[in-house]
A protein has these predicted regions:
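Non-cytosolic coordination micro-motifs
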Residues: 17-165
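Charge-dense, intrinsically disordered terminal/linker segments
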Residues: 1-16, 38
């Protein structure tokens, strides 16, 4: 029985070939994942429902991953979220509320000092993470975070560190 369970776990955790993208349910996520593969090469990890690039292979992001999902999101304009980008950013406790008010697509992991942006492309994610950095640096007043975030996204204010192929 133990051998059966070990083999089953090995099967479940086995990495898949990039062709697994063809079976994805959400066309927008599938199309964007394929676009990233074209620009940045094969991902480091491929599963049935996710592709992942890590170790700054895409710009300054610690990791970028696309999940076979399409989450409707209306702020600041209607779109769907499926790509996640993570950076090491330490968000002080007193700025957590300002970050939360700025966007529902900003995910803060205080234990790992990481912030993940989820949107429809890595450009919007770079803008979002750059916004969080500016907020922490004091360049944006916490009480203005929601309005400032919309401005950053709508005006395409990419941070200096963002380099796209």
């Amino acid at each position: 029985m133990k051998l059966i369970i070990e083999n089953w776990n090995r099967f479940l955790n086995e990495e898949k070939d990039i062709s697994s993208l063809d079976s994805w349910e959400h066309e927008d996520a599938k199309s964007y994942a394929k676009e990233l593969v074209e620009k940045y090469g094969d991902p480091d990890v491929v599963t049935d429902n996710m592709v992942l690039w890590k170790d700054n292979r895409i710009s300054e992001f610690k990791k970028v991953y696309v999940i076979d999902e399409s989450i409707p999101h209306d702020s600041p304009a209607p779109h769907h979220d499926y790509v996640y980008s993570t950076m090491e950013i330490d968000v002080p406790e007193d700025l957590m509320e300002a970050v939360a008010k700025a966007s529902e697509s900003i995910i803060v992991d205080q234990l790992k000092n990481e912030v993940t942006a989820r949107c429809g492309d890595i450009i919007a994610n770079a803008i979002t993470l750059g916004f969080v950095q500016k907020l922490i640096d004091g360049d944006i007043k916490p009480e203005n975070s929601e309005e400032e975030y919309k401005k950053y996204i709508l005006e395409g204010m990419t941070p200096d560190w963002f380099k796209e192929k």
